[in-house]
Swiss-Prot record:
Residues 1-14, 107-124, 159-168, 175-190, 208-217, 396-482, 510-520, 661-670, 760-774, 824-841 have a biased composition (Basic and acidic residues). Residues 15-26, 60-72, 97-106, 125-136, 143-158, 191-207 have a biased composition (Acidic residues). The keyword Metal-binding applies. InterPro entries: Zinc_finger_CCCH-type, Znf-CCCH_4, Znf_CCCH, Znf_CCCH_sf. SMART domains: ZnF_C3H1 (SM00356). The modification N6-acetyllysine is found at residue 814. The modification Phosphoserine is found at residues 6, 34, 46, 53, 59, 67, 74, 78, 83, 95, 110, 118, 173, 179, 487, 532, 534, 536, 842, 852, 868, 893, 896. It is found in: Nucleus. This is Zinc finger CCCH domain-containing protein 18. GO terms for molecular function: mRNA cap binding complex binding; protein-macromolecule adaptor activity; RNA binding; zinc ion binding. The gene is ZC3H18. Its main location: nucleus. A zinc finger (C3H1-type) spans 219-245. It comes from Homo sapiens. GO terms for cellular component: nuclear speck; protein-containing complex; ribonucleoprotein complex.
Length: 953
């Protein structure tokens, strides 16, 4: 104990009497054996009692809790109480030694702050318990036992006593020790209550087990020597281990088969730490090799564990071998039913279910702790396994055995029930599966019949479509013939007519329409888009007044989507109207050709009308009365009024009118167009998505193609048809303009969305296009007919690719398309439009400022491309070749997404297109050839796709 270690005490000082506690149990027992020196017993006893009370407290506290805080807090209390106890126990006789005792106590309290406090505390709380419970005569024995216990604890647990045990034992005479014990007895007899209070310390603390269960768990407690002798009066309350009785930790519920007889019969072997006979047994007994209470306990546990592991292994093997092991494993382990039957043991059930599943060896080994082992044994003691019980061959250690047997029976019953249920379930499952299989077979038969019918219908439809396509193609050809005269650029268009690519240039518009006619054919089977139907009507209407055509087309496209309505009208004007969705493109192409002005006004209005209106307004800044986006398309169709033309000019076309001047044919066209172009512009301005087309349209009214290509950009839907119509602008516009492409591919609504989504971008792009058109239109106006469309096509590709990346949603489809278009168109553009490309380069920056942030992003792309004239030229040159593939892709991906993606691009591309028109008709032939090839390829691809889609549609 700390007491012995206190610096003030010399081995021989009166405090030495306290040391016996520090001494080993053997020494204490030896001394206790003889009652020889009674002289000074009172003093020694008093001191010893003080020390015992302190020592017991510390020992207990070590066992229970070495909480320094509690001890320190109670320090003063402990000192006072110890002093009181000492005084009372000493009585008047011990007064001379009180000073020493007090000093010793002060030292002890300082040294034993932790230990003494709990002792004193519990003394106060339980002072009376000892007297009531223990008779006076046994009390001395108990006290001695306690003292020895304290010593034993100190020896076992602390090891502090070890140095003291032998050395101090030698120092102290046996007589002193004996006198200590005699004094103890005397004092107990004299002052039983008080001394008992001191003793009660230990006992109450033992009862205090409840207070400090955690510490007791953690620290092994010394075995109770008195229990080993059979003398322990504390019974279950004893704070030392009674091997079979209270050594189970907190779980006294689980009774262990104790290595030691519960009655206090002689221990299996001499207790290692506690001498067999504290009263006078030979020291040799104490020294005898200990059968430690816990080691025997451990051995018993080990035995039990080993047995349990074996049983578990067997059980697991059997379970694994059972055919329905998996089912049982999942269904039988812990069913809801089982829990209902045995709710008390729910936890155990869970354990049972878990343990068998896991590797048992690993599971059981971790629980060397008796508590866990017991629990686990208990868990798998119950019939965890369906086919066998886990039982010990050993005598049942549990008192709960009968209950467990009942539980097992219940579990077995439950398992049987579960098995029956499982069998029923399996039967039901099989029946259901059979029924399902039959149903599947029936469904397959039905599907086969339906497929056969569908095939037959498809064949019939294909035949009908072919007839329709032929009619449409004829109509288109007729319409193409008309658009040529319409456009002041007829020569170029006529030159291009043989080549659908040529249609891209203003003169080529007719060819573009022819080009679109094949597209129409491919799409005509897919009237679902509504494009195929409207195109034929659009052609007829083209033949009729442009306004009527635009109106009809606009109505059709509007049916598809508000944005398309405008584009549809413009398409109807140009052959490209073959696709109502493309009509915006074709209308632009038409506008390039004689019908160009008309289609322009309408086309711009429709494509812009849907979504672009918000962006348009920025474009409208020039005072164009922009019709509301929804109304813009129709209004533009209705009001291709010349008044809008001026606004258009003012808007994007402020520059456009100037470009108009450069080319007389352009000017004438522009003059023709102004009525329509203004509406178009207006519509474009009115509708955000249309705005792109309106920009290019208004700016290059003369170069109306480029503008319309911009609008076509807004009406990306028409892009595929326009691309097929070979208006280069239309092609790229289709790619660029979400509306046209969307309408061609998907119903107007998708286009409208895309137009709206991209209208902002398109507006920026279109503004740029307008600027470009204004810059490029002068050259374009010079050669609007022949070069206009082809140039626009290449230009559109250029713009389209920049726009494509921005149009993230559809970028994948359109980017590809645009890229192809860019190459072909850019090549053409370079050849024709290097000057116009340069012009464009300057415009894009201006356009960029005008463009909204979305526009800005597109402008950056377009601007970057425009900024580098060479790339634009390259695009212009390449745009033709790529244009066809782009058109194909557009058609292939008719979804409005791709069209909307392209939307931003078309405006940009259209500007290069304008430049390309400018570059001259010289390159138009080569471009036409390239474009024709591309368009044919695109047509083929589109036809294939349509062939696939029509069946789907």
């Amino acid at each position: 104990m700390d007491v012995a270690e206190s610096p003030e005490r010399d081995p021989h000082s009166p405090e030495d009497e306290e040391q016996p506690q520090g001494l080993s149990d053997d020494d204490i027992l030896r001394d206790s054996g003889s009652d020889q020196d009674l002289d000074g017993a009172g003093v020694r006893a008093s001191d010893l009692e003080d020390e015992e009370s302190a020592a017991r407290g510390p020992s207990q506290e070590e066992e229970d809790n070495h909480s320094d805080e509690e001890d320190r807090a109670s320090e003063p209390k402990s000192q006072d109480q110890d002093s009181e106890v000492n005084e009372l126990s000493r009585g008047p006789t011990s007064s001379p030694c009180e000073e020493e005792g007090d000093e010793g106590e002060e030292d002890r309290t300082s040294d034993l702050r932790d230990e003494a406090s709990s002792v004193t505390r519990e003394l106060d709380e339980h002072e009376l318990d000892y007297d009531e419970e223990v008779p006076e005569e046994p009390a001395p024995a108990v006290q001695e036992d306690e003292a020895e216990k304290a010593g034993a604890e100190d020896d076992e647990e602390k090891g502090e006593g070890t140095p003291r045990e032998e050395g101090k034992a030698g120092v102290q005479s046996v007589g002193e020790k004996e006198s200590l014990e005699a004094a103890k007895e005397k004092k107990k007899e004299d002052d039983d209550g008080e001394i008992d209070d001191g003793e009660i310390d230990d006992d109450d603390l033992e009862e205090g087990e409840v207070k400090d269960p955690s510490d007791r768990k953690v620290r092994p407690r010394p075995t109770c020597r008195f229990f080993m002798k059979g003398n322990c009066t504390w019974g279950m309350n004893c704070r030392f281990i009674h091997p079979g009785v209270n050594d189970k930790g907190n779980y006294s519920l689980i009774t262990k088969a104790d290595p030691f007889p519960p009655n206090g019969a002689p221990p299996l072997g001499p207790h290692p730490l506690m001498p067999a006979n504290p009263w006078g047994g030979p020291v040799v007994d104490e020294i005898l090799p200990p059968p430690p209470p816990e080691p025997p306990t451990e051995s018993a546990w080990e035995r039990g564990l080993r047995h349990a592991k074996e049983v578990l292994k067997k059980a697991t093997i059997r379970k694994e071998q059972e055919p329905d092991f998996e089912e049982k494993r999942f269904t039988v382990t812990i069913g809801e039913d089982e829990r209902e039957f045995d709710k008390e043991n729910e936890v155990f059930r869970d354990w049972n279910s878990r343990i068998p599943r896991d590797v048992r060896d690993t599971v059981l080994e971790p629980y060397a702790d008796p508590y866990y082992d017991y629990e686990i044994e208990r868990f798998w003691r119950g019939g965890q396994y369906e086919n066998f019980r886990v039982q010990y061959t050993e005598t049942e250690p549990y008192h709960n055995y009968r209950e467990r047997e009942r539980e097992r029976e219940r579990e077995n019953r439950q398992r049987e029930r579960e098995r029956e249920r499982e069998r029923d379930r399996e039967r039901e499952r099989r029946q259901r599966e059979r029924e399902r299989e039959r149903e599947r077979e029936r469904d397959k038969e039905r599907q086969r019949r339906k497929e056969e019918w569908e095939r037959e219908r498809a064949k019939r439809d294909e035949k009908d479509r072919q007839h329709r396509d032929r009619d449409r193609e004829k109509e288109r050809e007729k319409e193409k013939g008309k658009p040529k005269p319409r456009s002041p650029q007829p020569p170029s268009r006529q030159a291009e007519p043989p080549k659908k690519e040529a249609a891209t240039t203003g003169p080529q518009v007719k060819r573009a329409d022819e080009w679109k006619d094949p597209w129409r054919r491919s799409k005509s089977p897919k009237k679902k888009l509504g494009v195929s139907v409207s195109p034929s009507r659009a052609r007829r209407r083209r033949k009729t007044s442009a306004s009527s055509a635009s109106a009809s087309n606009s109505s059709r496209s509007s049916s598809r989507s508000s944005s398309y309505s405008g584009s549809g009208s413009s398409r109807s004007r140009s052959r490209s109207s073959s696709y109502s969705s493309y009509s915006s493109r074709s209308s632009r192409h038409s506008s390039f050709s004689g019908s160009r002005s008309r289609s322009r006004s309408f086309s711009s209005s429709p494509s812009p009308s849907p979504t672009p209106s918000p962006h348009r307004p920025s474009i409208r800044t020039k005072g164009e009365p922009a019709p509301p986006p929804g109304k813009a398309g129709e209004k533009s169709v209705k009001k291709p009024a010349p008044p809008p033309a001026p606004p258009q000019a003012t808007k994007t076309t402020a520059p456009v009118p100037e470009p108009t001047k450069p080319g007389d044919p352009r000017e004438a066209r522009r003059k023709e167009r102004p009525a329509r172009t203004p509406p178009r512009r207006r519509t474009l301005s009115g509708s955000g998505s249309g705005s792109g087309s309106s920009y290019s349209g208004s700016s290059s009214r003369s170069r109306s193609l480029s503008v319309s290509s911009v609008s076509s950009v807004s009406s990306a839907t028409s892009s595929s048809s326009s691309a097929h119509s070979v208006d280069s602008e239309d092609m790229y516009a289709d790619l660029a303009s979400p509306v046209s492409s969307a309408s061609s591919r998907s119903p107007a609504p998708a286009q409208t969305r895309k137009e709206k989504g991209k209208s902002k971008k398109e507006d920026g792009v279109k503004e740029e296009k307008r600027k470009r058109d204004s810059s490029t239109q002068p050259p374009k106006s010079a050669k609007p007919p022949a070069g206009g469309k082809s140039s626009q096509q290449p230009s559109t590709p250029q713009q389209a690719p920049p726009g494509q990346p921005q149009q993230g949603t559809f970028v994948a489809h359109k980017e590809i398309k645009l890229t192809l278009l860019n190459k072909a168109a850019d090549k053409g553009s370079r050849k024709r439009y290097e000057p116009s490309d340069k012009d464009r380069q300057s415009p894009p920056p201006a356009k960029r400022p005008n463009t909204s942030p979305d526009r800005g992003s597109r402008d950056r792309k377009s601007g970057g491309r425009l900024g580098s004239p060479k790339p634009e030229r390259q695009r212009g040159q390449n745009s033709k070749a790529p244009a066809a593939p782009a058109d194909r892709k557009r058609q292939l991906s008719p979804q409005s997404k791709s069209s909307s993606k392209v939307t931003s691009v078309p405006g940009k591309a259209s500007d290069p297109g304008a430049a390309s028109t400018k570059s001259g008709k010289a390159s138009t032939l080569s471009r036409r050839e390239e474009l024709l090839k591309q368009l044919k390829a695109v047509e083929d691809a589109i036809a294939r796709k349509r062939a696939k889609i029509p069946g789907k549609a």
